[in-house]
Amino acid sequence: MGERTGVIVAGGQSTRMGDVDKTVVDVAGVPLVRRVANRLLAVVDHLVVNCRRDQQERLAAALEGLSPTFAVDEVPDRGPTAGIMTGLSTVETPYAAVVAADMPYLDPELLEYLFERADSHDAAVPRPEEWFEPLHAVYRPEPMAEACAEALEAADARIITPLSSLDHIVIERDAIVEHGSLRSFESVDTPEDLERARERLS
């Protein structure tokens, strides 16, 4: 397990949560990002957090004792493709799980399965419904970071664009259900989502 890193992408704007930085909001006594980190650390040894510079102090306090490496966006608010690129650029292990900072139900067993399936490929990316989940996937850091950089240089910030140049495998719904929980993909985007998470996790 010493060959794995977890990357939390936390640099997005919390537009549907008002002026609150949702990454550090309290969820039943634990900051949201720490809930994500705790679940991620069940299957990785190293933690990287991608964020804006103005978030770093708050996130460091929320993750005290977990010793994360911070990968700060040089240019903020360029979207998740840039966040993935920046986070993966600091990774030194062969594979890394990349997840969003707002997924409090992250399933370690499903992440373990993604690591297993990614072996010998550039990526293992779930598709629980019609859409891919690139912010709940496992990557070889260098190929994915390069693919993200190429997409951004081409002014194509769509989060699925980098996958087209990778040797990636798709994890379909049936395999997800067999090896984990679909709830793993649920995120906290609105005040209603936050209240639901507090009730479920209290």
Curated annotation (Swiss-Prot):
Positions of GTP binding: V9, A10, G11, K22, N50, D77, D102
Reaction(s) catalysed by this chain's protein: Mo-molybdopterin + GTP + H(+) = Mo-molybdopterin guanine dinucleotide + diphosphate
Domain of life, source organism: Archaea
CDD domains: MobA (cd02503)
Compartment(s): Cytoplasm
Coiled coil: none
Binding site for Mg(2+): D102
GO CC annotation: cytoplasm
One Pfam family this sequence matches: NTP_transf_3
PANTHER family: MOLYBDENUM COFACTOR GUANYLYLTRANSFERASE
Membership in a protein family: Belongs to the MobA family.
Note on domains (UniProt): The N-terminal domain determines nucleotide recognition and specific binding, while the C-terminal domain determines the specific binding to the target protein.
Function: Transfers a GMP moiety from GTP to Mo-molybdopterin (Mo-MPT) cofactor (Moco or molybdenum cofactor) to form Mo-molybdopterin guanine dinucleotide (Mo-MGD) cofactor.
Protein name: Probable molybdenum cofactor guanylyltransferase
This protein's encoding gene: mobA
